[in-house]
């Protein structure tokens, strides 16, 4: 039976190797897969594929806008967090129908320390987190890059000497966060463009490959 949504065009960005996700979208919509890598494997699960400029290229958003016009795209959905802020700014400016949060939220979620402060402002629990040079009151801790994703360059430190070593070892802006032991849970939240929560899917994180 044909899906009633096959006439809906969805532009997926940063498809990379996320073949299963692209394939799932393609079963219910006309999918345009966009990635800077013209050989990205997941693009072959879509009905249409396009190589686009890199996220940091000023022509990135205009290229996506052109694809929206060409295919009548009703939704731009990023499959990576790397372009969240870029798409959020474009959405706020009325350039793209992107399914992303407001720019302030997108900016904070890519900045782990910014996320910590955002959670605190809203009265939500967050592990004690400090920047290098600030006092650490509890060990062990995790030393990790302040910006970025993919569970990269994360190191456990059991004392202040190890923490100071790893702060310099990762060679980029770092933060120090209380080590949280026990099972890790990830919550996938589906919301509409007005920020209303439609569904939440909790998952136990058994393994992380590139943050997924």
Language-model segments: what does each one mean?
Residues 1-101:
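ATP-binding N-terminal substructure of ATP-dependent carboxylate-amine bond-forming enzymes
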Residues 14-18, 81-82, 132, 160, ...:
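Short beta->alpha connector loops
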Residues 41-45, 59-62, 106-114, 153, ...:
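Short, charged, surface-exposed secondary-structure boundary motifs
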Residues 49-55, 129-132, 155-158:
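Short acidic-hydrophobic, aromatic-tinged amphipathic segments that line or gate anion-handling sites
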Residues 66, 112-118, 191-194:
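Short, surface-exposed amphipathic charged segments that create phosphate/polyanion-binding patches used
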Residues 104-128:
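Glycine-/Pro-rich loop/turn segments that contact NAD(P) or position catalytic residues
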Residues 119, 127-129, 137-154, 172-182, ...:
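ATP-grasp fold ATP-binding core
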Residues 158-212:
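Phosphate-binding site of ATP-dependent enzymes
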């Amino acid at each position: 039976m044909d899906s009633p949504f096959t006439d809906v065009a969805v532009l997926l960005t940063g498809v990379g190797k996320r073949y299963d996700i692209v394939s799932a979208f393609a079963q219910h919509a006309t999918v345009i897969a966009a990635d800077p890598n013209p050989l990205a494997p997941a693009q072959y699960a879509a009905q249409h594929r396009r190589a686009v400029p890199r996220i940091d290229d000023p022509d990135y958003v205009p290229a996506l806008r052109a694809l929206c016009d060409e295919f009548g795209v009703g939704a731009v959905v990023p499959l990576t967090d790397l372009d969240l802020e870029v798409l959020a700014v474009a959405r706020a400016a009325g350039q793209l129908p992107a399914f992303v949060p407001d720019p302030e939220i997108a900016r904070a979620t890519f900045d782990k320390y910014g996320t910590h402060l955002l959670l605190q402002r809203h009265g939500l629990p967050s592990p004690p987190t400090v920047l290098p040079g600030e006092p650490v009151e509890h060990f062990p801790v995790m030393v990790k890059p302040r910006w970025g994703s993919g569970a990269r360059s994360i190191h456990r430190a059991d004392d202040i000497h190890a923490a100071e070593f790893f702060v310099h070892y990762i060679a980029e802006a770092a933060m120090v966060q209380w080590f949280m032991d026990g099972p890790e849970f990830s919550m996938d939240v589906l919301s509409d463009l007005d920020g209303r929560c439609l569904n939440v899917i909790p998952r136990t994180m058994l393994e992380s490959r590139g943050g997924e």
